[in-house]
Amino acid sequence: MSGTFHGDGHAPMSPFEDTFQFEDNSSNEDTHIAPTHFDDGATSNKYSRPQVSFNDETPKNKREDAEEFTFNDDTEYDNHSFQPTPKLNNGSGTFDDVELDNDSGEPHTNYDGMKRFRMGTKRNKKGNPIMGRSKTLKWARKNIPNPFEDFTKDDIDPGAINRAQELRTVYYNMPLPKDMIDEEGNPIMQYPRNKIRTTKYTPLTFLPKNILFQFHNFANVYFLVLIILGAFQIFGVTNPGLSAVPLVVIVIITAIKDAIEDSRRTVLDLEVNNTKTHILEGVENENVSTDNISLWRRFKKANSRLLFKFIQYCKEHLTEEGKKKRMQRKRHELRVQKTVGTSGPRSSLDSIDSYRVSADYGRPSLDYDNLEQGAGEANIVDRSLPPRTDCKFAKNYWKGVKVGDIVRIHNNDEIPADIILLSTSDTDGACYVETKNLDGETNLKVRQSLKCTNTIRTSKDIARTKFWIESEGPHSNLYTYQGNMKWRNLADGEIRNEPITINNVLLRGCTLRNTKWAMGVVMFTGGDTKIMLNSGITPTKKSRISRELNFSVVINFVLLFILCFVSGIANGVYYDKKGRSRFSYEFGTIAGSAATNGFVSFWVAVILYQSLVPISLYISVEIIKTAQAAFIYGDVLLYNAKLDYPCTPKSWNISDDLGQVEYIFSDKTGTLTQNVMEFKKCTINGVSYGRAYTEALAGLRKRQGIDVETEGRREKAEIAKDRDTMIDELRALSGNSQFYPEEVTFVSKEFVRDLKGASGEVQQRCCEHFMLALALCHSVLVEANPDNPKKLDLKAQSPDEAALVATARDVGFSFVGKTKKGLIIEMQGIQKEFEILNILEFNSSRKRMSCIVKIPGLNPGDEPRALLICKGADSIIYSRLSRQSGSNSEAILEKTALHLEQYATEGLRTLCIAQRELSWSEYEKWNEKYDIAAASLANREDELEVVADSIERELILLGGTAIEDRLQDGVPDCIELLAEAGIKLWVLTGDKVETAINIGFSCNLLNNEMELLVIKTTGDDVKEFGSEPSEIVDALLSKYLKEYFNLTGSEEEIFEAKKDHEFPKGNYAIVIDGDALKLALYGEDIRRKFLLLCKNCRAVLCCRVSPSQKAAVVKLVKDSLDVMTLAIGDGSNDVAMIQSADVGIGIAGEEGRQAVMCSDYAIGQFRYLARLVLVHGRWSYKRLAEMIPEFFYKNMIFALALFWYGIYNDFDGSYLYEYTYMMFYNLAFTSLPVIFLGILDQDVNDTISLVVPQLYRVGILRKEWNQRKFLWYMLDGLYQSIICFFFPYLVYHKNMIVTSNGLGLDHRYFVGVYVTTIAVISCNTYVLLHQYRWDWFSGLFIALSCLVVFAWTGIWSSAIASREFFKAAARIYGAPSFWAVFFVAVLFCLLPRFTYDSFQKFFYPTDVEIVREMWQHGHFDHYPPGYDPTDPNRPKVTKAGQHGEKIIEGIALSDNLGGSNYSRDSVVTEEIPMTFMHGEDGSPSGYQKQETWMTSPKETQDLLQSPQFQQAQTFGRGPSTNVRSSLDRTREQMIATNQLDNRYSVERARTSLDLPGVTNAASLIGTQQNN
C-alpha cells in the first residue's frame, strides 16, 4: 500500500502508513520497528528526586518529627566513598547539611539518649515512638468523604495522606547512615513485625476480656446487680444461687459462641503467619535489628507451630475439601515428576502451568546466568564481583519476613508483604496478580518490575547489587504509591534514580498468577501493609425496631421504678402501723426503721419485678434474626446459578429493616445493567457503521406507539442475516488467527466492504487506522484460554476497554501480547511490534486515556516520530480538538457529533478516538517534564496530570464508538413491582445523562407522561438566573418548588414531609448532574429545597456523580426525612453509598466483589431485590413487630400479678410463685410460641407477596410496630394480670379452694400455681390468636409449651427438695375448683381481645385480611408455587389467572392501612373501583408503562421547523447562530440521505429535554469551536 492522505476534509493523516503493508507478498522485514535506546548518559538531574518541603498547613510537630532525609539536585558527595550528603529537615521546611562519618562516609545524626522500642514506625527526638502498632491499625477506620469537598480526589483517603508523610528509606546490601543507627549500632527505625493477629482474645485474656465485653451490655449489668442484691439476706431472695442461673447460662453460651468465632480467627491467623515463602539468606539486613527471643516467646512459637500442624492435618484428613486438595496436590506432584524428571530443577520453580502469552510470546527463553550486560542496561549489578555461594533463597514463615528482606514468590503463591518488584521470570519484567482478596476484583492485573533490576535472575545476581529505596510512609490507598529506587552507577559513579509507582508494587493479600516467579524487596510489613490498613470493619448497623426497642425498655424501666417506689413507700408506711405482729415476733429486725425498711423494700421490689425488663428478650430477638438470615440464605429462588451465588446475609440483625424500605438508591452500570459491554456501532471519517436493536431503542420506539415486539423480531432477523454475511466476508479478508465468530458483537457488512476498499482508498485507510488505534490504546492483558491454548482471552480492568480491543480483534487487528517495549499486533494475519513510549492512564478527573507510540522514520537515517492516541468522553475529546486550518474537517466533526447524538439516544455508551502526531524533538522535550513529574514523591499524581494535559491537545478526530450495556434480566418488572409497593427509586450513576435517561425509560423508571425537571448550571438558565452556578441551582430549585408544588422549602415543610410517606401524586422526575448536585448539597437552605423537590417527584436521576456524592445523597435523605433507605450497587465506587444507607445490598457482578464485601446482603442480580424486600423483608418486619410486644405483654402479666399480691402482704417482698416458676416462665413456659411466631409466621405466602406488592406499604407507614401498639399490648397485659390474680384470690378469699379430702390450698405457692397456669395458657393462646399461620408445627410447639407448666409442677413438687411446694401438683390438680377457675379465667382473659379482633376483621378488614380471604377463595390458585413476576422465564398465567389479576388490582387497598371501609363481601365482587393503583387525581401511583403517539411525515417536518425544536437544540452552545444553522443543514442532509434516523430527532424535539451533559451534537460542536 502506498500513498498518503492528509487532513483535507476527508480523513486525518495516518502516521502508520509506512510501517505496515496489507498485500499478500508482505515480508517480515516490513514489520520491523526500531527498538528504544535508553540514554545511559542522562544527567543526574533527570533522575533526581525534587526536594521535599512542607506546606503552610503542616503541623509544627510533624515538621519537627520529619527526620528522614532525601537527596536533592545539589547533593554533595564525599570524594572517597561517593556517599551522598543528605539534608535533614530543620523544622522550617528546608533541609540543612548533615555531617558525614569520616570512616564510612555515611550520613548520620546524633540522637543522644535514644531509647529503642520494639514497635512503632517512627521516632521523635526523644526516641519515643510516634506511631505504635496499635495506633497503626487504627488507620484502618475509614470515614465517608465530605460531600462538599473537591470531588476530583474522591479516591484519596485523608488518613493515607497524613501517614504518607512519614517517609522511610530502606537500604539493601549497604550499611545504614549514622543518623539511622543508635549508639549500639542498632537501627533507630523500628517496623512492625509481619506477624498479624486478628483475634480479640488470647488463651490468657479470653475469660477476663470476654466477660468484660459482655458486661458492656446494660441488660447484663442490670441483671448482675439484681443477682448481687439477691445475695444479701436482707433482700429476701429464697435461693440466690438459683437466681443467677439464667444470667450464667446466657454468659456461658455467649462466651462459647465468641470462643468458637475467635478460634476460627486464630486458625486463620496461624495459617497466614505460618505460610511459607522464600527469603534470601546470606546478605545481612541492616534495616532491622535482631530480636532477642525470650524463653516465653520460644514456648509460644513451639506451641503455635504444633497447633498449626495439628490443624492442617485435621483439615487435610477429616474434611472433604481438605481431602480433595490433598489429592489434587498429589496428582500435581506426580505430573511434575513425570515432566521434569529426577535431575531437573525443583518443582517450585519449573512445574507451573503458565498459560500466559505476553512478553515471551513466540520468543525463546534466555539463559540469564550467562547473559552479558548490554549497552542499554542499567548498570546496577556488579558482575565483576565473584558470586557468593552462601546466598540462597530458603523457606521461611511469613511472620519472619522483615522490612528490607529479598523475597521470591512462586506461581499461585500469596504475597507475604508489600513488596517492590525487582524482577520476574518474564523477560520483560511483567507479572500477573489477582487482587480478589484485596479489592474484590477478579480480573488479573499486570505489575512491572523496575527497569534497573529487571536483569536480576538468581540469588547470585541480587547478592552483587547495592541500592536504596526512598519511600513514602504507609497509607491505605490501594491505588497510589510513590517512591524512588536509587543506586550508584558502576560506570561513572553517579547516583541514578528510577521512580516507583503502584504498578511496581506487589501488595500483601494478592496472588501471583501465570508467572513462574517474582522477586522483590519488602517495603511494608504487618500493620503497615495496605490490606491491614484497609481492614476496617463495615459500620455496625442496628435495625429501626432494635433502636425503638430501647425506648420501650425505658418505658418499662419507668414503670418498674414506679412499682418499686410505690412498694417501698407502702412497706415503709406499713412498718409503723400499730398492732402488727412484727412488734411481738420480729423485734429488732435488720431494717430497723420505717425509712430504712422502705429503702430496702424498694430494692426487694426491683428483684421481684425484674421480669418487666426481660433478659431473655434480647436472646430471643437474636435467635429470630439468625433464623431469618438462614432462611434468606437458603432461599433457592434467590440463588444465581450462573454465578453459583446465593443471597448471602452479611448483617444478620437488620432483616426487619428490609420490610420498611421507602427509598432505594441504585447504581446503574452493573446494577440495573449487566456491565457486559458489547461493541455495537462506530463512526469513522463521518460514516456510521453497525446495526443494533438495543433495549433503550425498543423503549424509545414503544413510547412512539410502535409495536416493538413485531419490529424487534424483524430487526433481529435482519441483524442476524447481516452478521452471517459479515462473518463470511471477514474470513475471506485475511488469516486472522484470533477470529472467533461466536464472539462477534459488531455487525456491519458495510464496514468489511470498506475495509476492502469498496468506498475508496481513503475510507479504507481510515477504517484501518481507527481499528489499529483501538488495538494500541489500552491496558488490556491477554491470557491463553485453558481449554484452547491457541485462543487468547482478554483481561481488562474495564469491560468497555475489553469490548473495544475485542472488536478490533474481530475485524483483523488482534492484540496478541506485550513486550518490554510495547505491544504485538496481528494485523490481517501479519504480526507487528509497536513500541509504546508512554501510557497516560485513565482516571475519573481526566476522563480519558492516552498512549504514545514510536513511529520509525521513512528512511533508515530519518528521525522517528511520536504518535499520541487518545480516547475518552466525547465532550472531553471535542474540547481538545485542533482548530487549525486543515486539521479537522468541519463536515466530519458535524457528522460525527450527530452520529454520537444518535448513539446516545439509543442508550449506547459513547467514546471518541483522536490522535496527535509529534516530532521527535517535541516528544523529547515533553518526556523530560514527564520524567521529572514521575520522579516526584510529593504530589506526583497532580504533576503527572498537568504534564499529560499539556500534550493531550490539538488533537485530530478519528471517530467515535458506541457500546451497549444491556439491562439485567427482570429489571423493568422488578422496578415496576417496587413502585407498586410504594418504594421510591433514585438512580445515582457516574454515567452520562442521556444514557441514564434512556435506561430509565427502558426499565420503567420513567414514562412518557412524566415531565422532567432539569437542574443544571449551564445553558439558557445562565441568562435567566445569572452566571454564578450556585445562584442558578438555587433559583431553579425555588422555581420548580413554587411552580409545580407550591412550596418554598421552609423548615416547616420539611417537618410535614417527614410525616408523609405516600407515593408522590404528581408526574414529575428530577434530572441533575454532578456539578449541580455538588452545589445542591452545600448549604442548609439549598439542601432543604433540593430534598423537598426530590421528595415530591416520582423518580430522581443523579448523573455524573462521584462516590462521595452518592453517599451524601443517601445520608441527606436518611437523616432529614427519617425514612428507611436501601442502597444497591456492584462496584467499589458504590461502597460509600452502601455503607451510608440503612441497608446495603451488593451485587456480585463483573466489577469485582468489593461492594459485596462491604454490604449487608449480597445478591446475584438486581431482580432478586424484589423478592428479598417484598417477601423476606416484609415477613421479617411483620414477625418481629408482633413478637416484641407479645413478649412485653406476657411479662407484664406475670410481674403485675406479684404487685397485686403485694397489696395484701404490705409489699414485704414475699414471693407469690415458687421460685422455679420465676426462672422458667420466660425460659420454658412462654418462650417457644413467641420465638416461633417470629421465625415461621406468614400472613400470605411468597407468591402473593409478589403478586400483590401493595401489601408492603404497611412497613413504609410503620403500622405494624409503633409505641401505640406497644402501649396497647401493655394495657392488655395489665388487664389480664388483674384477671390472672384476682380470680384465684376471690376463690381463695371465699374459702372455695379445697381438695377432695377437705384439706385447704391456702399456701401462697399454691395460689401462685393458679396464677402461673392461667397466665401461661392465656399468653400462649394469645400468641396463637395473633398468628396467621396455623399448622401442625406451630400448634405442636404451643401445645408443648402449655403442657410444660403442668409437667414441671408435677415433677418438681414430687421431689422433697421442693420443701413447701411438696405434693403441690397432686393437691392442686386434684381440686375441681382449680379447673373451674382455670377455664373461666382464661376465657375472661382472652374474650375482650378476641371480640375486638373479630369485630375489626369482619367490619374493618385490613388489606392483608382481604387478600387472605381471596386466597381462601382460590383467586391465586392459577399461580404456580414460587411464581416470580421478575423472572424472565416465568410461566404465563391462564385467562382465569388474568381474570384473577384483574380482581387483585381492583382491591380497594386503602392508604389508611387497617381502616378500609370495604366489607368482606366486596372481595368477591368484580365491580370494584380501582382506588389503590391511581391517585386522587387519577394519575398512576407507580411507574406505569404508557403508550403514546405516532408521528406522520408531515408532523415530523413541522416539529423539525418548530420553535420548540429549535429551543431544544440550543442547550450548551455558544452565542454563534452560524453553528446551529450549519449543523441543522448537515442534519437535514443526513436525514434526507438516510444517514440519520429522523425518529431520534423527533423524539428529542418532542420531549424538548434541555439536559446537562447530554451528548448533543450542537453542544459538541460548540465545545470544539469555543476551545
UniProtKB/Swiss-Prot annotation:
Deletion phenotype: Decreases phosphatidylcholine and glucosylceramide transport into cell. Simultaneous knockout of DNF2 leads to abnormal endocytosis and abnormal cell surface exposure of phosphatidylethanolamine, phosphatidylcholine and phosphatidylserine. Simultaneous knockout of DNF2 results in cold sensitivity, and sensitivity to cobalt, nickel, zinc, calcium, and magnesium ions, duramycin and cinnamycin (phosphatidylethanolamine-binding cytotoxins) and papuamide A (phosphatidylserine-binding cytotoxin).
Effect of residue 571 to A: Decreases phosphatidylcholine, phosphatidylserine and phosphatidylethanolamine uptake
GO biological process terms held by the UniProt record: ceramide translocation; endocytosis; establishment or maintenance of cell polarity; intracellular protein transport; phospholipid translocation
Site, as annotated: Involved in the release of the transported lipid into the cytosolic leaflet: 615
Cofactor dependence: Mg(2+)
Annotated spans, Disordered: 1-94
Region (Involved in phosphatidylcholine substrate selection): 234-241, 586-590
GO molecular function list: ATP binding; ATP hydrolysis activity; ATPase-coupled intramembrane lipid transporter activity; glycosylceramide flippase activity; identical protein binding; magnesium ion binding; phosphatidylcholine flippase activity; phosphatidylcholine floppase activity
Phenotype when changing residue 578 to A: Decreases phosphatidylcholine, phosphatidylserine and phosphatidylethanolamine uptake
Amino-acid positions noted as binding a 1,2-diacyl-sn-glycero-3-phospho-L-serine in the UniProt annotation, renumbered to this chain: 1393
Reactions listed under catalytic activity: ATP + H2O + phospholipidSide 1 = ADP + phosphate + phospholipidSide 2; a 1,2-diacyl-sn-glycero-3-phosphoethanolamine(out) + ATP + H2O = a 1,2-diacyl-sn-glycero-3-phosphoethanolamine(in) + ADP + phosphate + H(+); a 1,2-diacyl-sn-glycero-3-phosphocholine(out) + ATP + H2O = a 1,2-diacyl-sn-glycero-3-phosphocholine(in) + ADP + phosphate + H(+); a beta-D-glucosyl-(1<->1')-N-acylsphing-4-enine(out) + ATP + H2O = a beta-D-glucosyl-(1<->1')-N-acylsphing-4-enine(in) + ADP + phosphate + H(+)
Function summary: Catalytic component of a P4-ATPase flippase complex which catalyzes the hydrolysis of ATP coupled to the transport of glucosylceramide, phosphatidylcholine, phosphatidylethanolamine, and small amounts of phosphatidylserine from the lumenal to the cytosolic leaflet of the cell membrane and ensures the maintenance of asymmetric distribution of phospholipids. Does not appear to transport sphingomyelin, inositol phosphoceramide, or phosphatidic acid. Required for efficient endocytosis.
SUPFAM superfamilies the record matches: Calcium ATPase, transduction domain A, Calcium ATPase, transmembrane domain M, HAD-like, Metal cation-transporting ATPase, ATP-binding domain N
Record-given protein name: Phospholipid-transporting ATPase DNF1
Matches recorded under NCBIfam families: ATPase-Plipid, ATPase_P-type
Post-translational modification: Phosphorylated by FPK1 and KIN82.
Mutagenesis or variant effect for residue 587 to A: Decreases phosphatidylcholine, phosphatidylserine and phosphatidylethanolamine uptake
Gene of this entry: DNF1
Effect of residue 555 to L: Decreases phosphatidylcholine and phosphatidylehtanolamine uptake
Species of the source: Saccharomyces cerevisiae (strain ATCC 204508 / S288c) (Baker's yeast)
Phenotype for residue 575 to A: Decreases phosphatidylcholine, phosphatidylserine and phosphatidylethanolamine uptake
Effect of residue 550 to K/S: Does not alter phosphatidic acid or sphingomyelin uptake
Effect on the protein upon substituting residue 621 to A: Decreases phosphatidylcholine and phosphatidylethanolamine uptake, and increases phosphatidylserine uptake
Membrane topology summary: Multi-pass membrane protein
Residue numbers of Phosphoserine PTMs: 53, 81, 92, 104, 351, 354, 358, 365, 1506, 1552, 1563
Cytoplasmic topological intervals: 1-214, 261-553, 616-1188, 1241-1270, 1329-1334, 1397-1571
